[in-house]
Amino acid sequence: MPKPTPPFNNHRRHTLRLAAGSAAALLLPVGRTASAQVPPMPKSAVTINVVDVAGNLALTQDAIEAYQKAHAQWVSKFNFTKMPAPELPGKLKAMQAAGRTDIDMVLTGTDFLAAGIEQGELTQLMPAFASKFPNLMANYQPAAAKMQELAGDYGIEVTFMPAGPLLEYNPDKVTDVPTTPQELLAWCKAHPNRFIYARPANSGPGRTFLMGLPYLLGDKDPKDPVHGWDKTWAYLKELGAYVEYYPTGTGAVMKELGEGSRDMTPTVTGWDLNPRALGIVPKSFKVAPFQHMTWVNDAHYMVIPKGVAPEKIAVVLDLMAYLLTPHAQAYTYDQGYFYPGPAVKGVTLAMAPAKSQESVKEYGRPEYDKWLGEFPHTQSLPPKSQVEAFRIWDQQVGAQKTK
């Protein structure tokens, strides 16, 4: 590993110093193309359109904008758009059918990653562009490297979160905190409509809850939602009788939790920390693990749709390489949105902007370290299985109650 970049002392929007030394030790120096397979950089500056379907810009936008300032000869500006993950496959399909892809890079969770691979909408990055990412797997944290494997040859992991599932609750309303799925069901029966979670196809906490239940319930095959999740599907259908509706995203869940219209929800490390740091959920709200839980890890990825012009691919690949340098990775601590955030080894909280350090210290939970060491970890479902799990949930669990 390279010598760590000195700690940040400035506001997170201060322009990043694109230190060639730190970049070179981890990846190729920004701007260098090491193979004829990698397209040449553009002769004049281009505009790059970035779509975020994961909330990842909270973690990476500062670094992306700093890249533009340092490389105005290649990129004149970045346009940023946010949309729900389930809407993007149809949008890309229409663009690609018309022969005009106006989206140059997507920042995504495992949801669109899975759908994009399944529907053949993504550019294969490896092995053609491997020269831009030397030692890629070795530079990831071990658990993050496992999540990179899910991307196959189509995505580059940029941020990592151990995730959950955990239960977040209002301690003034929930005094008998459930520690098993059975206890959660009993609580929901006694307190109908006070528990809520969002549609898994567009919610990190929702899909982590979905993918964590097979381990908690002792299902036949936690990696096979079609043939191995009999207990999970039966449980979710029964639980659904006491859930008023399923929001289409996690933001609505946290708003209702904070306003007091719900008392408990499944969560993950980042969605516990960040809404409290932002004042959406009271700081006093608590989280609890399930007994004998398995952590289902999560990640965000950078992908390139099919149909992007070669000169734009060159810029996006160079940006991706930069976003994996320790200096840029330190920004991903943010205010805990994807806690901790960095996917790359050796990126400590002391290297993050002061605001990030303050938020994590004030709103983080010391018990996380204990739980992360106490319980085993696994990865999110592989892309094809994840698509199947979302389809079954939509049809059998959420069909009448998602809005």
Question: Model segments located where?
Answer:
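N-terminal secretory signal peptides
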Residues: 1-14, 18-30, 35
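Early extracytoplasmic/lumenal segment of secretory-pathway proteins
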Residues: 39-114
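Extracytoplasmic ligand-binding site segments that recognize negatively charged/polar headgroups
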Residues: 53-62, 81, 85-86, 108-252
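Short helices/loops that flank or line small-molecule/ion binding pockets
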Residues: 89-102, 114-119, 251-261, 265
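A bilobed periplasmic-binding-protein/Venus flytrap-type ligand-binding module shared by bacterial periplasmic
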Residues: 166-173, 214-216, 299-312, 331-332
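Extracytoplasmic/periplasmic substrate-binding proteins
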Residues: 242-308, 349-358
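Mature extracytoplasmic/periplasmic domains
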Residues: 302-370
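Conserved C-terminal helix/tail region of periplasmic/extracytoplasmic solute-binding proteins
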Residues: 366-403
